[in-house]
Each structure stands twice: as structure tokens, then as C-alpha cells.
Amino acid sequence: MSAKEKFTSLSPAEFFKRNPELAGFPNPARALYQTVRELIENSLDATDVHGILPNIKITIDLIDDARQIYKVNVVDNGIGIPPQEVPNAFGRVLYSSKYVNRQTRGMYGLGVKAAVLYSQMHQDKPIEIETSPVNSKRIYTFKLKIDINKNEPIIVERGSVENTRGFHGTSVAISIPGDWPKAKSRIYEYIKRTYIITPYAEFIFKDPEGNVTYYPRLTNKIPKPPQEVKPHPYGVDREEIKILINNLKRDYTIKEFLVNEFQSIGDTTADKILELAGLKPNKKVKNLTEEEITRLVETFKKYEDFRSPSADSLSVIGEDLIELGLKKIFNPDFAASITRKPKAYQGHPFIVEAGVAFGGSIPVGEEPIVLRYANKIPLIYDEKSDVIWKVVEELDWKRYGIESDQYQMVVMVHLCSTKIPYKSAGKESIAEVEDIEKEIKNALMEVARKLKQYLSEKRKEQEAKKKLLAYLKYIPEVSRSLATFLASGNKELVSKYQNEISEGLFKLISKKLDLINIEEYRKVYRVDSE
């Protein structure tokens, strides 16, 4: 007879402690990178989303050489965190300010807490937080750990001091086992790629070797921040409907519920939906049965005349900032970008942006350099498993004038949405959703056509210059013949006319060849004509 099975439950904190790889913490190198990434993303969400030009300082110090423990500290000038929210914000897994129907860099309420869990698994130092909300007269300090069994914060130490320096923002320091030599290139690449799409931010990065890199602000233009919007009927299921109903503060009828709690539903649309679902408009929404909720959701899915989801919940980078960032980092001969119109998948709005940079200082390689972004987050790992890479690889670049297998090109794609279909909680690759894949392809083809036009004009220009250069060698002979004809045998006039004609012809051709050194060709001409 077999022994009885023992059943138990896990808190969210315990689950991610046991499965750190699901949150992007499979090893020390990746853990160090992921910690830097999560803290920078929190800092950006605390600044640009609220109209503040970001000033972000990142420091990584080796504090225990024998155990390879690093202290990661990120300081921002954002809106700060209300002190009563700090313990849960850093010490309770799946607690977040980002569970809203608008675009955010974070999604799961996990990121920095996963770093705290990984930290606790390997060393005993608590996370250190210093924060001051805008206009606060106090700076609040905390040292926290997570009670893994209860998924609750443990406040090791707390305090506050007078805010005499007018500081607002947050400083977070986490001590974590890491592998700097292996993580170094990824961390530098992550910061560089973040800077490409946030040229309105200032970054200062000090690495464990003492190297300090400064990324200056290039513009004061900040993208329009996303706004929280009501859910779209295409994007909700039965449980979400029930949550919306339970959270109602008013005693709505079903029709009032549809009109007031959803986007894209007015009086006329509500009447049509309720008729199709066989529901009475005046019935109290809190009296809906399980079967009636199911009918309502099924009607949502079948109804084909909803307006597309509102794009107010999204914040694009914008074509100007994309090109500014590409030009600053890669110094190309050509850069172009496109921001597509809003689309939707499963009721969630999304926008695809694409950019391309070509030539100049871009290194030549067997593949283009592909920059992947989701909600303004650079995606560094798992490149080949991402839908963006798939589309780039399948695109026929020869059709757009890229004739060689040697690429001197950067391709950038940004997907923003209220719901990014990541393949895992580590947020490093985007799943192959048909509507999104199609829109990425359309964006790349559109920006590739701009590149094709540039390359076509460049080739025509080179061909024209080649022809004009060929004409230069005939200047002595042509000018001599014309001078002889015009001088009618007068040898003194022949020499004079020849110089004038050759000079005029040379100026005419060299004007077309603005890259040609005039003095060099004049020297060549004089040698040839003697």
C-alpha cells in the first residue's frame, strides 16, 4: 500500500525562490545583468512616464572578492515612493503599481523582488532603499528582506531625515552574487541600447573596475506618457468581468455597466450586444448569473463592429528620437524610422516602430545588428527565439538594395502594448502572435523602402561621378582643340584660351563632384597639358 501524498501550497515568493530562472536569474552573470536591468527600468518608469527628464546613476561595486558579491546601486530623480508603500513594493512578490491598463516597462510585480529573493538565497545583506516623493520634506530610508513563507516584507530597519537638499527620487542598493567578467558586455550593451531610445535621459555608469561612462542628454523632448484606459471588450474574459463587477462602487444596470466600464461601447453598441446575448438592459449587473456572464463574453468575442482599442494607453518613442539615438551611437551615413498606426491583438492595442541605420561607422558583419525593444525595454538575451529576429531574418533584404552577404546595417524594432506577449517572466523574447508579426513585417518593409531609395540615389550619384571623372582626362585635349579653333592660328591666344577653357570645364565638372579635391585635379591637369 502506497504512502499518502502530502499536499502543501507555496507562496509566490517561495515559488520564484525555487524557480529563479523563470524570472531571469539562472546564474550569477545573468542575475547581475537582470538586477541592473530591473532597477534601471523602475527608475525610467518613475521619471519619463511622469514628465521628468531622467538623471540616472548606476554603480556596481565588488564588496566581497572571495564570494564574488556585488553591490548594485541605482539612483534616480523620479517621483519617489510613498513611505507607506515601500515595504510592499520591495518585499511582497506580485505587488505593484503597474497592474493598470496602460503601457509600462514592468508587468508582473516581480522584477526587483526576484533580485531580492536571489540575494537572500546567497548572502544576508538586506535591500537598502532611500526615497523621497516630490515636494516631501523628509527622506525615508529602509532596509528590507522578504519573508518567503508568508510573502511579506521584513522591515530590518527604517528611518527618515530632513530633506535639506530638495531631493526627490529613489535610491536602491542590492547586494547579489554575480559574475562581472561574463556579464560585463551585456550590461554595457543594455545601457547603450536604453540610451539609444531615451536620448532625453542622462546616465552615469561606474563599473566594478572603476570605469565611469557618461551618456549625456541629447534633447529635452520626452515622448507623450501613456494614459490609463478602460478595458476593451475583446480583451476580457469571464473572470475579469467578475472582478470588474465586484469592484463597482455604483449599482449599475447591465447597460450602464457596458457603457461606463468599457471603451468602444456606447448606447447603440450596448443595445446590440445585449440583444445578441439575450440579456435585459435594465437587469442589475450584480445579479448576472455565471451562465449570463459566459454569454456576454462570448458575444464580445463574436461582435465584429467594435472600434479598435484606444492608443492613449501607449507611449511610442517617436521617429525623431529613434533617429537621434541611432545617429549618436552608430554614426551612420543614413538613418530612417517609422512609427506605424495603432493596431490590436486580442483586444490589446499595440504600435510597432522600426528604424534602420546604414554605413558610416557601423561594423560590417554576416548579419545585421538587430536592436529589439518591448515597451522601451532593450531585449538582450534569447535573440534568435524572438519574433522580431524571425521577421528580420525572413525579410528579403536584396529586394531593398542590400546585395551583399556582408551587412553594414542596424535594424531596430520597438513593440509597445498594454500586454506584451513575452515567452517568460524574464521578459527577453516576444512570442509569435500573428497580428504582431504581420505588423512588424509591415514596419520593416516600410523603413526598408526608405533605405532602398537612399541606396538607389547613392548608386546613381556614384555612377554620375564615375562618368564625370572619366571626362576629366579629356579636358586637356578638348580645351586645346577649342582654343586652336577660336584663336585662328594666333599662338599667344591659343595658350590663353586653353587655360581659360580648361579652367571653366574643370570648374563645371568639379561642381558636380563636390567631394573631389580641386587642387589635386588642377595639378594633374597641368602636368598632363604641358
From Swiss-Prot:
Entries under CDD domains matching the protein: HATPase_TopVIB-like (cd16933), TopoIIB_Trans (cd00823)
Keywords (A to Z) from UniProt: ATP-binding, DNA-binding, Isomerase, Nucleotide-binding, Topoisomerase
Enzyme Commission (EC) number: 5.6.2.2
Role summary: Relaxes both positive and negative supercoils and exhibits a strong decatenase and unknotting activity; it cannot introduce DNA supercoils. ATP is absolutely required for DNA cleavage; the nonhydrolyzable analog AMP-PNP generates nicked or linear products from a supercoiled dsDNA substrate. Generates staggered two-nucleotide long 5' overhangs. The enzyme is covalently attached transiently to the 5'-ends of the cleaved strands.
Catalyses which reaction(s): ATP-dependent breakage, passage and rejoining of double-stranded DNA
SMART domains named among the record's database cross-references: HATPase_c
Activity's thermal dependence: Optimum temperature is 70-80 degrees Celsius.
Family statement drawn from the similarity comment of this UniProt entry: Belongs to the TOP6B family.
Activity regulation, free text: Not inhibited by the DNA gyrase inhibitor novobiocin, instead inhibited by eukaryotic topoisomerase inhibitors such as m- and o-amsacrine, ellipticine, and the quinolone CP-115,953. Radicicol inhibits the ATPase activity.
Source species, domain of life: Archaea
Residues annotated to bind ATP: N42, D76, S96, S97, K98, M107, Y108, G109, L110, G111, V112, K113, K427
PANTHER family: DNA TOPOISOMERASE 6 SUBUNIT B (PTHR48444:SF1)
Gene encoding the protein: top6B
Organism the protein comes from: Saccharolobus shibatae (strain ATCC 51178 / DSM 5389 / JCM 8931 / NBRC 15437 / B12) (Sulfolobus shibatae)
Molecular function terms, GO-annotated: ATP binding; DNA binding; DNA topoisomerase type II (double strand cut, ATP-hydrolyzing) activity; identical protein binding
Protein name as annotated: Type 2 DNA topoisomerase 6 subunit B
Subunit structure: Homodimer. Heterotetramer of two Top6A and two Top6B chains.
EC class: isomerase
Keyword DNA-binding included in the entry's annotation: yes
Gene Ontology process terms (BP): DNA topological change
InterPro entries found in the cross-reference section: TopoVI_B, TopoVI_B_transducer
